[in-house]
């Protein structure tokens, strides 16, 4: 037993997670009614979601309060990369539609009581109102835009504090980070539970009716992750980007795929940034910000499903209109964190460009919820892994260096 525990401790986290995935897969097929196994996944995701807001709040305050005057954080570059990648992903989705035009079977009403926003202005109004939320309420509700806003305010205010106060804040941040490490070490067990739940509840029948749609969605996201993002990274770094790209997909994308939550993956991304030796002053802000606005996967989902609806209804779309759709999708995707239901509930906003009624648009949303088990997992993996990727790319960029 001791030999087994020793070997387990020496095994890398990714290998442990792989073992957990395989065990969860078999248990989901063999004993699908053993619901207690699924509880392990819920506890793992719940733990990550619970600690992530506190982690972001303490890290940002600590980093800003001790930030050196004249220190470079690369935040403008990172935000520029987030926006560029999101728009590029939306544009790629349009091109994919011309190559693989999809149609949908719009006969199942959307099984959701959520109401879509009436337009982009409503999306950003909601986002702005969330920013000025009560800071305590923001932490309890995991409202990261508000958490970031108040953490920045408190961090700047604490710059004039004495060193002992700053050290105390750093101690809180370090203690929170240690708790995060303990939770992440439970990832193999948690992901085993998540895989079990997914297999036992959904099976693999979903691949039959919506196989082509799933293939196009996943294929487009893979193309963006393995081709588009590396091109952007190469332009910025002027060196082979794939070791960094694959490291981010392996260490961040895999956990994000199973948790299906960018918020829950924030602690994982923070740890990866630390392992990559990135500047803490930068990544403590860029990672939670990326979880809120870096939404390449959401832009792909919005465009693919919207254009599939357009094809189904026989509406002709010229490229200038499709380009405008890319702009709308990119802007809407950046506000996805401000909308209950995320990217799927923003589809009616995009559909409105083509005069598609809200009833039809909500049927498209219904299709999105049906394939959401796979679509949402891949979308989150792409979104979350690129938070780390572009934070690292900005720091390693050849631009702005003497």
From Swiss-Prot:
GO terms for cellular component: plasma membrane. It is a multi-pass membrane protein. Pfam families: SDF (PF00375). GO terms for biological process: serine transport; threonine transport. The keyword Phosphoprotein does not apply. Disulfide bonds: none annotated. It is found in: Cell membrane. Belongs to the dicarboxylate/amino acid:cation symporter (DAACS) (TC 2.A.23) family. Involved in the import of serine and threonine into the cell, with the concomitant import of sodium (symport system). This is Serine/threonine transporter SstT. It comes from Streptococcus agalactiae serotype V (strain ATCC BAA-611 / 2603 V/R).
